[in-house]
Amino acid sequence: MEKNNSFIKTIGGKIFAVLAIAAAIFCLAALYVITGVNAGVNNDKNIILDDGWSVIYNGESYNDVNLNNFRLTKTMGKGDKVVLYTSIPKNFKYDTPVIKIPTTSSVLKVSVNGKLVYTYGEDRYAENKLVGSGWHYIPVKKTDAGKNIRIIITSTEAATFSSIDAPVLMEYSDVFQQMMIKNRVRYVSAVSLIIFGALIMALAGIMMIKTKGMSRLFWIGALSVTVGTWTACNYRLMQLFNIPLPVTTTLEYINLVLGALSAAMYFKDNVYELKDTLMINLYKIFVGCLSVFIVVSFTLQFTNLYHLPSLLEVIHVFIVLEVIYMMVLMITSY
């Protein structure tokens, strides 16, 4: 027993030292990013293309549309298509102009004056593969000013979106800086969660070899990693490293589901300490159903029979049920 206590104290000291160093690095990184010199980047230079659109959807035409206020009559389903028309502004002065267009699990086609200049996802959709979600940067020429632009968005999954984010005309050289400035807190948080979680999981794994009761620490680490990875994917940090959209989207949904499992496993000891038969049985049913869902959904995802984005509503149901259960558990415990 004395040997085990000595081991725990030694490892505990190492954990504290590692986390203290990591926390210091995090604070310095956060301070650097938040207060960094960004004088050369000006978001005001961007031209938001939100007004004056013509939209064709579900056989209906809408003119002089402001995309900020526009909502589709129903949520886009698999195979649904929306077409948007407008003119490229004449007053931009960019050296390397691009139009930033966000999409959610959709095929994208962009034409300028009837000439196709950009396409994404058509081949993957034809093969029933995951297309993915993210930002697209469509290059345009200075001579394209004033020309007509047509955007065709085709949904590849069930229940993808019901509103359309306004495209943005901007300078390509500002893309990276603007992404970092706008999302710097999220990015630092995501990276920190992943690093902290990985360290905790590794240390907990080592400690579990010598002593019991370290599983909660392991699941804290797992939850930290999944939340950090989901954040990085959801806010498009992965695109900074040119990771393909299908990979980013797959990681986003996998970590969303595994995060729910990690949280459930963390509370396992609390559930059994109550010695409440009903709560224990409900916990077993929930974890069992979630585990089956993970196996089935991941199998469907990687065999391209059915993709995780189409199961988002089911995932949300699991998360809501888990939150309700955890609230009841905490109330019952205290």
Language-model features: where?
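Extended carbohydrate-recognition surfaces in non-catalytic/accessory domains of CAZymes
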Residues: 5-93
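Cytosolic-side membrane-insertion boundary helix
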Residues: 165-211
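Juxtamembrane segments at transmembrane-helix boundaries
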Residues: 191-334
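Membrane-helix interface motif
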Residues: 37-38, 161, 232-237
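Intrinsic-disorder/low-complexity, polar/charged segments enriched in Ser/Thr/Lys/Arg/Asp/Glu/Gln
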Residues: 79-87, 96-98, 135-137, 148-150
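Aromatic-lined ligand-binding clefts that engage carbohydrates, nucleic acids, or primary amines
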Residues: 93-112, 151
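Extended low-complexity, serine/threonine- and proline-enriched intrinsically disordered segments
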Residues: 45-60, 106-116, 167-168
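Beta-strand-rich ligand-recognition modules
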Residues: 108-148, 154-166
